[in-house]
Amino acid sequence: MGTTAIIAAFNEEKTLADVLRALTSSPHIDEVIVVSDGSTDDTVEIARQFDVTTIALRQNHGKGYAMRIGVAWASHETLFFVDGDMFNVTDDHIEALVRPVAGGDADMNVGIRHRGPVLDFLHLKMHCGPVLSGIRVMRRSVWETVPDKYMERFKIEAALNRFCTYSGYRQQNTVIYNLGHVIKESKRGILNGLFSRWEMSREVFLLLFDLYLFETWRWSVPEEMPVAEYDLFE
């Protein structure tokens, strides 16, 4: 069973090459797909320098949609979602994330960046706040448990947690040490970064009520995937 790494990227020209270097040289990764979500910088040009499949959406559709496009093109049953704004990615990180799923010990393994023993304990042991990491490995069947309505924008990570457990699949969390991440305020400027963070937090907060309290997904009707124009480079 092979593993496809999928990067949903929006204007990640500063860090994407380092992430791709790690993925394309790893023996644990069999295929890499980059989905540029309407990037306006050199994200697509950088991706095309590597032996990967590059899908360039002509407009921005949100992270969940870009991930969905990547899954549609993936050749393998193990999916490794990776953020394009990370740095210091090593093969040890990749192996720690892929191995539990590839070895049959978990159906979804979520990578949590180390933030110190206290914060790690509060987050993972005391469950103070949802696990919303964009770095995760899963079987394709776990991805397919998520209703279409949640495969958009910032909803997808919280929805994956909910439906992985609800469907009886096994979720594992793995703390990843020495993995860097470029924060929104650094990429987009203070004001735009804070606004983007607020938008994401508000969307996730309302989503959690929907997923766990109102459960509107129980009577939701499957939706067709919206059609988007894109350029494909293989």
Model regions and ranges:
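Cell-envelope/extracellular polymer assembly enzymes that use nucleotide-activated donors
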Residues: 2-4, 159
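Short aromatic/hydrophobic "clamp" motif used to bind/position activated sugar donors
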Residues: 79
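Glycine-rich, basic loop-to-helix element that forms the pyrophosphate-binding segment
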Residues: 57-74
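A conserved acidic beta->alpha catalytic loop
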Residues: 36-44
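Conserved donor-nucleotide/metal-binding helix-loop-beta segment in metal-dependent transferases, i.e.
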Residues: 91-110
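Hydrophobic helical membrane-anchoring modules
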Residues: 151, 158, 165-234
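Short beta-strand-to-loop element that shapes/binds the nucleotide-sugar donor at the catalytic cleft/hinge
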Residues: 109-123
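Short, well-formed alpha-helical segments that are part of the catalytic scaffolds
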Residues: 11-25
